[in-house]
Structures are given as structure tokens and as C-alpha cells.
């Protein structure tokens, strides 16, 4: 059943029409609300996200984020990229979202501190380790992707804490991360092929006084953008919103200041008022534009999205005592025939929405491919 669903999902990734030549990574730039290549062709990107983590990669290349596993990890991704972009076998990805997995950037000798948990806790982050593994691991993976005809969008290590405030420690963390990444000569030389997504899933952003403010998102990310541009990176920057990257209304009135940017958005079943029980495409279009009004004037990268049907008879009770049905292995639960088709109509309506699935496993039967 899952193999059959993967085939359907792969077909859903195909754009309704192809504008630029597929498999050619000509540098991209923002032109109005579209992505254009160096020849002026309109470009819409479709691909997957992944993270060089032993756990999320199901220990296929090793068990630890240590130097002895670097070569095997790079080789693993080289093979995966060969499967993602292979029209002869029915795969048509042209972008890869690379998470700078914090398992490599966190110092194992540091004690974790603070109240934030999981990947939102940055107390063990090491700038020295980021510099080391940027050159030793992350950028070699990115180069392998480019060699296979894939654009690359880089996401910083970890996820945002729930509550952010202008001038806080996490903003300084993002400044440090992007200062290191954007000053790297390889990254700058590949501007246009490599783009940068500033943060992952902010929930709330407040002004420097801890108050709600219409300018807080702009004021939080503008200083990060300024550092990146000062370092000479000329490629596309993707700006996140709040609400786990679903709220962008304030950017319509108070946008960031830059000449080559778009917005990174997340979409899952149940968001924007759309699900398998409410899959009217016109309502989906209306709600998406209401929450993401910037879709009218800037390109959108939906950097996380996935869905698969409910697995009958399986599930669990969550921490609130609510029954949560299982699916075929994705984050979101929905069918392509209902929610998926409605989402396709949203993309076709606006014509400037690119997307990366939340996991390579959403697109490929990896274990079968690696046999």
C-alpha cells in the first residue's frame, strides 16, 4: 500500500507545466512574485527535505554524528540524489532542502542548560563545529545534490523555541549561524543555486519588550538578512512566518527590506481550514491567501508538506486523551484524492509555489532502492 501511495505522491510533485529545462541548475533570482533562471525562464521547484541524522536516516550510514561516519553519510546522500532526480524512472525532483543537523553542530562535551527542549535548545551549539562540518559534511552533500541537477536550500540547525523576542538569544544564534554560512566562499560562489531559509517554525515573535507587535517578524529577521548581504551572499533568502510558518499577514504591511527574497511556508492537512473532510479548493485558496497574503507579490517555498491516508484500526491516544489515527508514515494524514487534489489546485491557482516534502521517505522507498 505504501509503495502505491509513494507513486501517487511522486506524480503529485510534477508541475502542471515545465518552464525551465529540467535538471539544469541555472542560477535563480526573484522577479516579482516568480523565480526566474538566468535566461528569464519561470521556475517552480519540487523536491524533498532531509537531515544527515543517524536516527532520521534509520541508521543506514552509521549510528553516530562522528568523523568516522562522514564519508559514508556523503555517499548515502549521493545515492539518494541519484534516485530523486531520475526521469527515466519517474522521479522529477529539482530541489533539496538540507537541514544542518544539530547532531553535528552540538558539542557533546557541553552540558545542556535552559528550559527549551529537543532541537529548540541551543545551549550546546558550537560555532567551531558548524564551521568544521560545513566544510567537511554539509557542503559536500550540497555539492552532490547540485551534481545531480538539484537546487539546494539550507535550513539552520534545529527548530525555534516557542516564544521569540527581538534581541533574544535565539536571534543572536541565527546571526551567528548565518554569518558563518554566508561568509563561506563555496556558498557565495554558488549563490543562485543555493538559497537560505532563515529559521524553522517560529511560533510567536514579540518585540524587544515582549509585546505583540505587527513589526516584530520584520524586526527579528531583518538584522539576520543584513548580515548575510554584508558578507556578499547574493542568492535567494527565504523568510519564515509565525504559527509554525503559517502566518504572514504582518509582512504584507511591514515587509523585510531586500531585493532577492521569498517566503518559506509550511502546509499540512488540517491547516488553512482544509482537510479530508473539508477539501473545497476555493476555500483552501481563500484561506491560504488570507494567512499568506504575500503570495501575491513574492515567490513561496512550501518547505514542509506531506500527507498519507489513515491506516485503518491503528493509532494512539495523545497526551490530551484524544485518539490520533496512524497513517502510512507521514506527518500529515489525508488522501491525495481529496486534500491532495485541493492543494494541487492552490498551487496551480497562484503559479508561484514551490515545495519540498518533509522527508525523502515521503517520496522514495529508500530501503528498496538501496538494495
Predicted feature descriptions by range:
Residues 1-8:
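Bacterial N-terminal signal peptides that target proteins for export
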Residues 20-49, 58:
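N-terminal module-boundary/linker segments of secreted carbohydrate-active enzymes
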Residues 66-95, 100, 104-195, 217-227:
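An active-site-proximal structural segment forming one wall of the substrate-binding cleft
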Residues 27-28, 52, 56-69, 164-195, ...:
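Extracellular glycoside hydrolase catalytic/binding regions
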Residues 101, 155-159, 199-201, 242, ...:
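Short loop/turn motifs enriched for small/polar and acidic residues
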Residues 8-17:
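Bacterial N-terminal signal peptides
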Amino acid at each position: 500500500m505504501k509503495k502505491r501511495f509513494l507513486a501517487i505522491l511522486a506524480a503529485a510533485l510534477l508541475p502542471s507545466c515545465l518552464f525551465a529545462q529540467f535538471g539544469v541548475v541555472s542560477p535563480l533570482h526573484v522577479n516579482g512574485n516568480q523565480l526566474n533562471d538566468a535566461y528569464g525562464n519561470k521556475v517552480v521547484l519540487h523536491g524533498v527535505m532531509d537531515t544527515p541524522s543517524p536516527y532520521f536516516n534509520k541508521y543506514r550510514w552509521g549510528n553516530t554524528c562522528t568523523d568516522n561516519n562522514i564519508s559514508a553519510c556523503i555517499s548515502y546522500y549521493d545515492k539518494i540524489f541519484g534516485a530523486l532526480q531520475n526521469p527515466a524512472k519517474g522521479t522529477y525532483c529539482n530541489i533539496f532542502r538540507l537541514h544542518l543537523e544539530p547532531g553535528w553542530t552540538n558539542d557533546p562535551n557541553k552540558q545542556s542548560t535552559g528550559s527549551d527542549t529537543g532541537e529548540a535548545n541551543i545551549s550546546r551549539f558550537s560555532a567551531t563545529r558548524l564551521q568544521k562540518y560545513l566544510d567537511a559534511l554539509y557542503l559536500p552533500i550540497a555539492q552532490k545534490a547540485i551534481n545531480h541537477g538539484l537546487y539546494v536550500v539550507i535550513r539552520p540547525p534545529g527548530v525555534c523555541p516557542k516564544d521569540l523576542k527581538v534581541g533574544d538569544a535565539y536571534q543572536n544564534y541565527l546571526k551567528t549561524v548565518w554569518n558563518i554560512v554566508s561568509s563561506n566562499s563555496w556558498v557565495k560562489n554558488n549563490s543562485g543555486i543555493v538559497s537560505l531559509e532563515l529559521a524553522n517554525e517560529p511560533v510567536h515573535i514579540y518585540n524587544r519588550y515582549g509585546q505583540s507587535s505587527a513589526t516584530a517578524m520584520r524586526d527579528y529577521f531583518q538584522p539576520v538578512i543584513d548580515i548575510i548581504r554584508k558578507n556578499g551572499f547574493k542568492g535567494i533568502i527565504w523568510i519564515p512566518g509565525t504559527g509554525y510558518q503559517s502566518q504572514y499577514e504582518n509582512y504584507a504591511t511591514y515587509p523585510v527590506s531586500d531585493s532577492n527574497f521569498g517566503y518559506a511556508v509550511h502546509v499540512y492537512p488540517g491547516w488553512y481550514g482544509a482537510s479530508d473532510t473539508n477539501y473545497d479548493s476555493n476555500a483552501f485558496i481563500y484561506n491560504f491567501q488570507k494567512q499568506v497574503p504575500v503570495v501575491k507579490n513574492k515567490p513561496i517555498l512550501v518547505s514542509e508538506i506531506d500527507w498519507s491516508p489513515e491506516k485503518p484500526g491503528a493509532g494512539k491516544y495523545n497526551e490530551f486523551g484524544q485518539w490520533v489515527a496512524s497513517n502510512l508514515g507521514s506527518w500529515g494524514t489525508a488522501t491525495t484524492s481529496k486534500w491532495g487534489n485541493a492543494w494541487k489546485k492552490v498551487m496551480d491557482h497562484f503559479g508561484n509555489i514551490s515545495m519540498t516534502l518533509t522527508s525523502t521517505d515521503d517520496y522514495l522507498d529508500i530501503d528498496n532502492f538501496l538494495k
